[in-house]
């Protein structure tokens, strides 16, 4: 079980690649290590499936909490459903590697990345992407690789490769670039309103590092004596495609050039043309080659018709510069936007529509206890801003069972979440947990960017003081030979038949989120730069339309949103506020009908639907944590009487005792002769003993309202 280990130097670090030791029955496996982070990646190929017309590729990213020396917190104490960040890592592997398999492949493929050990200085996700490529090469699966990925951060004016978790938190940029020797195949980024030129430079910086990792992969398989399997497309029977080209080209061209057709009308006419072709084929002799081919493969006619439509639409864009809806290449579809479309029981709402894509977003304000706890390998264990994306079947006119969110929904929600994070107020000044839900009511392309726009409107409608509004647009690409056309605001058919889906979100100042997926094996940096640059005027146009609906965050929140106060106390006094067994804080919440959260740093957050109740709770806590000095005067209320004295509440939640000898300058036989429960008295702090107990006195303290003035008045709500 010795295996083969190869060490490579990359950006001043050592990366170790161990092959032929682990998972011997997998098609290919590699343990890729950097620092104390180790990821085992396997690639396995099974026999092909009959009757399918897609590549059955599955990518899995498995986090094991033993990798961080932890035991799962679930009842069964084992990992269950993958956490959200693991799902996003699955997509990070899938998106760059899927276009590198030949489109005609029908074999079952599975790539599994298992995090075996994690080092906070080396996030494992980009190692898993590079490992997936090497494992595929080792499995001798036909593949247009190698492919590799790196993460790029920006600290000050310097780009850094593969930053640590802590560096990512401080970085103005969190960018993942994946590519082949031919070009970039995937980009994923979150940024602090980064200018377009800086983003382009960062992608270029990352791609140069990707090329180095590709070289190391080639050297590794060469040392192992493995020859890469280059995909060889099998010979195709062109009988049916040639027949359709002859019979349908004119009719399809007429439909694609009717720019006033709606999506439904265009789809209906194309379906009609396909149905007529099917009827014509059915009328052919049984011995005819076309009829025989269609009869032997139930999906051949549909796939051939789709391929013909795709090539004609692409040719129309490249040659004529016209899209199926008549727009120019850089034109955005008609936009409408509205804020506050739902009753104020919903804290904030926004409706955004672009063409036939319509998204309704809602914003809900919560308390710190509503934050999402993340039970995964990432050191960051809480989320205070959540974005959830829902894509019901009716949004595309279909029927299917309603199930829990899939990887696509989770990925789209994360992208929209990342786009808004840079403009949200810090929790110190706006101590709310925020949840935005985007309901896709109608889909015809770019629903994730519609969710970004709807989220902005919903947050502003909820009174969240965001730093700037955020909008987004999806860019597309058609590449035919040396001819390349970049499309602004692609709709569904252009996404489906095009070569790229490039989503860019940001403010007027710069980019906050970016995601690029390819259907080709690489894109030149020049074209990426054109797409990023072309997205800016589209984004500014969309922002202008959104601001016509609501130009700034509302000054007031929904009356049904919780009112919150945030203040700081001495961390050493947190125990005083909580009390034995939590009795003190429980008593405050019950008395004031509020929700109280205390952080280890001493930040206290009080939430209530009644502002006065929140203020009362604040006064009680401040009273509990206020340091009392000897000689101070207070107005207070007698709360208890005992034979040797009386207790007086001098601050909310804080009592002192007047010994019977301190009730008067004269001898007092019975405490009740001077004070009774409920009496309001002015007292002076006589001393604070070594156990922190406050001893009070009435002796020499005027009770007629004359000076000296008390330091603190009675608690709020008392009389």
UniProtKB/Swiss-Prot annotation:
Q: Which Gene3D superfamilies match?
A: GHMP Kinase, N-terminal domain (3.30.230.70), K Homology domain, type 1 (3.30.1370.10), Nucleic acid-binding proteins (2.40.50.140)
Report the record's Gene Ontology biological process terms. mRNA catabolic process; RNA processing
Map out region (Disordered) in residue numbers.
699-719
The record ties this protein, via SMART domains, to: KH (SM00322), S1 (SM00316)
Q: Which segments does the entry list as coiled coil? A: none
Cellular component terms (Gene Ontology) = cytosol
Q: Where is the signal peptide?
A: none
**What EC number(s) has UniProt assigned to this enzyme?**
2.7.7.8
Q: Which residues form the KH domain?
A: 562-621
Q: Which InterPro entries does this entry report, sorted A to Z?
A: ExoRNase_PH_dom1, ExoRNase_PH_dom2, ExoRNase_PH_dom2_sf, KH_dom, KH_dom_type_1, KH_dom_type_1_sf, NA-bd_OB-fold, PNPase
Q: Which compartments does it reside in? A: Cytoplasm
Mind listing the GO molecular function terms for this protein? 3'-5'-RNA exonuclease activity; magnesium ion binding; polyribonucleotide nucleotidyltransferase activity; RNA binding
Could you tell me what reaction this enzyme catalyses? RNA(n+1) + phosphate = RNA(n) + a ribonucleoside 5'-diphosphate
A Pfam family (short name) is PNPase
Tell me where in this chain the S1 motif domain is found: 631-699
Keywords carried by this UniProt record: Cytoplasm, Magnesium, Metal-binding, Nucleotidyltransferase, RNA-binding, Transferase
Q: What does this protein do?
A: Involved in mRNA degradation. Catalyzes the phosphorolysis of single-stranded polyribonucleotides processively in the 3'- to 5'-direction.
**Family designation:** Belongs to the polyribonucleotide nucleotidyltransferase family.
Specify the protein name.
Answer: Polyribonucleotide nucleotidyltransferase
Q: Which organism is it from?
A: Synechococcus sp. (strain RCC307)
Gene behind this protein: pnp
């Amino acid at each position: 079980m010795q295996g083969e280990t190869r060490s490579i130097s990359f950006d001043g670090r050592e990366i170790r690649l161990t092959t032929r030791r682990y998972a011997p029955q997998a098609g290919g496996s590699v343990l890729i290590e950097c620092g104390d982070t180790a990821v085992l990646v396997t690639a396995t190929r099974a026999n092909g499936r009959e009757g399918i017309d897609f590549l059955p590729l599955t990518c899995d990213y498995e986090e094991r909490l033993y990798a961080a020396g932890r035991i799962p917190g679930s009842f069964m104490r084992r990992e269950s459903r993958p956490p959200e960040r693991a799902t996003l890592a699955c997509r990070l592997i899938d998106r760059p590697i899927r276009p590198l398999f030949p489109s005609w492949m029908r074999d079952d493929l599975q790539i599994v990345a298992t995090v075996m050990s994690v080092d906070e200085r080396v996030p494992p996700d980009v190692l898993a992407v590079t490992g997936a490529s090497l494992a595929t090469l080792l499995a001798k699966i036909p593949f247009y690789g190698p492919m590799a990925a790196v993460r790029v951060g920006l600290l000050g004016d310097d780009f850094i490769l593969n930053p640590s978790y802590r560096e990512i938190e401080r970085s103005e940029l969190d960018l993942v670039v994946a590519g082949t020797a031919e070009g970039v195949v995937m980009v994923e980024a979150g940024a602090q309103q980064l200018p377009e030129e800086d983003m382009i430079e960062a992608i270029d910086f990352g791609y140069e590092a990707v090329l180095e990792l590709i070289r190391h992969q080639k050297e590794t398989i060469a040392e192992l004596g493995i020859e890469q399997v280059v995909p060889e497309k099998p010979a195709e029977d062109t009988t049916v495609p040639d027949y359709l080209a002859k019979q349908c080209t004119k009719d399809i061209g007429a439909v694609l050039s009717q720019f006033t057709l709606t999506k439904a009308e265009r789809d209906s006419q194309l379906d009609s043309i396909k149905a007529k072709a099917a009827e014509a084929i059915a009328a052919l002799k049984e011995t005819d080659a076309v009829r025989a081919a269609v009869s032997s493969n139930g999906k051949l006619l549909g796939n051939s018709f789709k391929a013909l439509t795709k090539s004609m639409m692409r040719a129309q864009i490249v040659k004529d510069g016209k899209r199926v809806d008549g727009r120019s290449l850089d034109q955005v579809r008609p936009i409408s936007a509205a804020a506050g479309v739902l009753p104020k029981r919903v804290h904030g709402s926004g409706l955004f529509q672009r063409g036939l894509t319509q998204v309704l977003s809602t914003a809900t304000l919560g308390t710190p206890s509503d934050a999402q706890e993340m039970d995964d390998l990432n050191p960051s264990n809480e989320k205070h801003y959540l974005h959830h994306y829902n894509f019901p079947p009716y949004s595309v006119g279909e029927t299917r069972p309603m199930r829990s969110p899939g990887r696509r929904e989770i990925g789209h929600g994360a992208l929209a979440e990342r786009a808004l994070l840079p403009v949200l107020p810090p929790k110190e000044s706006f101590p709310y947990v925020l949840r935005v839900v985007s309901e896709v009511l109608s889909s015809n392309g770019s629903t994730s960017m519609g969710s970004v726009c709807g989220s902005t409107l919903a947050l502003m409608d909820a009174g969240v003081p965001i730093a700037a509004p955020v909008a987004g647009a999806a860019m597309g690409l058609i590449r035919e030979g040396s001819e390349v056309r970049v499309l602004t605001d692609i709709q569904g058919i252009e996404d489906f038949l095009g070569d790229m889906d490039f989503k860019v979100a940001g403010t007027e100042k710069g980019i906050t989120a970016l995601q690029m997926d390819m259907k080709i094996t690489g894109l030149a940096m020049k074209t990426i730069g054109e797409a990023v640059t072309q997205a800016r005027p589209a984004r500014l146009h969309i922002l202008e339309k959104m601001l016509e609906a609501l130009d700034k965050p509302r000054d007031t929140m929904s009356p049904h949103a919780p009112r919150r106060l945030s203040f700081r106390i001495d961390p050493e006094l947190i125990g005083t506020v909580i009390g034995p067994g939590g009795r003190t804080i429980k008593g405050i919440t019950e008395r004031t009908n509020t929700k109280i959260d205390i952080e280890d740093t001493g930040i206290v957050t009080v939430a209530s639907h009644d502002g006065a109740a929140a203020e009362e709770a604040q006064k009680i806590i401040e009273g509990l944590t206020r340091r009392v000095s000897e000689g101070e005067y207070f107005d207070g209320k007698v709360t208890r009487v005992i034979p040797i004295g009386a207790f007086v509440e001098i601050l909310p939640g804080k009592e002192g005792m007047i010994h019977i000898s301190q009730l008067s300058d004269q001898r007092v036989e019975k405490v009740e002769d001077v004070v009774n429960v409920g009496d309001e008295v002015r007292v002076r702090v006589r001393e604070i003993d070594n156990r922190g107990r406050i001893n009070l006195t009435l002796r020499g303290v005027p009770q007629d309202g004359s000076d000296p003035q008390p330091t603190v008045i009675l608690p709020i709500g008392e009389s």
